[in-house]
Amino acid sequence: MERPLKIGITCFPLIGGSGILATALGTELAARGHDVHFFSHAQPVRLDLSRPRIYFHQVEVGHATVFPCPDYTLPLAVKMAEVGQSQRLDIFHVHYAVPHATAAFLATEMIGAGAPKVVTTLHGTDTTLLGPNPQYRAAIEHALIHSDAVTTVSESLRRQTEETFQLRDEIRVIPNFFTLNPSTKSREEVRRELGISDREFLVVHMSNLRPTKRIDLLLRVVAAASRRPSIRLLILAGASFEPFQALVDELGLRENVIVREDAAVVEDFLPAADAGLYTSENESFGLSILETLFFGKPVVAFRIGGIPEVVGDAAYLHEFGDIAAMAASLDALVNSPDAARELGERGRARAEQYFAATNIVPQYEAVYRQVIAKCHRA
């Protein structure tokens, strides 16, 4: 029997695909008997510290007066080095190359012989937004080259990464996963709390509202739908929705839009929804889409990035920017509940078949053991 591992996971703590995936992965790894140590500047929103074998090490952002700006990379590297050495960690699994893989590289240099091996998972931003920027490109490339393994969450992102950076080793694709937790409220209870009647069609959108999520297009799709009077849009926002309030008023959607900010637990909202709507201009995977599929809700989205790999033929996909086509698909779901239900069930079946934790977590364990074994052979 293989021994349990000691794994350090570094991620951002906020609502967003990378942090949510990293937290879920660590939780699953701990349930499988591994010790998991999280590093971040705040406790990740979905991290349950009451579970056994899960530890959290908070990193204080540097505020030394000699620096013009607060520093995070160096305090993070020092904390990772301290814990990595004292706990004899086997792996640093970092989500995002900068600053996390850079901090991991520095930490391993501080530790020296016997340092943890570094596995870097790219979720998109390093490649699509920061990679083309000459201020970051060399640092990202350095961090990836000095990782013992690099993974991406989709084949689309793997191709983009290989085109953007000059890397020596193979990039492995390990998709995201989702573990369905039971809802604590019924569909009727949630809709009643939201002020939505059973006759209204509830569309859900979950994101951190970053510019790439194109919330402007999200609102315009709903505004363009002919069944707009019966559509309510629930936005589970990982950031302030205030910048978009003016557009809501401009489009006359004040009666259609409901916003819940910092909603970390989606299980209570998704059962009350009838469909999911996503309008990103760049999406390497689409974890929110996967969560929507797991609840058997039909999805309407743009055909970009890794989204087709997630949904297959179990969603309505359209070319980016085609608001009319997106609105027409939304109308079709409203007009045909049976077709909407059938599409949602196809999506659920696909999610359960390909993106369950039981399929994905062992792939990460295999990568960990491969890099450890490779080092020992060397």
Can you name each region flagged by the protein language model?
Residues 298-301:
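Short hydrophobic beta-strand element within catalytic cores of glycosyltransferases
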Residues 43-44, 178, 206, 210, ...:
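Glycosyltransferase donor-sugar binding loop
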Residues 281:
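Aromatic "clamp/platform" in nucleotide-sugar-dependent glycosyltransferases that forms part
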Residues 197-213, 219-222:
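Conserved donor-binding/catalytic core segment of Leloir-type glycosyltransferases
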Residues 245-263:
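Nucleotide-activated donor-binding/catalytic signature segment of Leloir-type glycosyltransferases, i.e.
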Residues 316-323, 332-337:
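Conserved acidic donor-binding segment of nucleotide-sugar-dependent glycosyltransferases
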Residues 183-196:
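A short helix/loop element that forms part of the nucleotide-sugar donor recognition site in Leloir-type
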Residues 158-178:
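Helix-loop-beta element that forms the nucleotide-linked donor phosphate-binding surface
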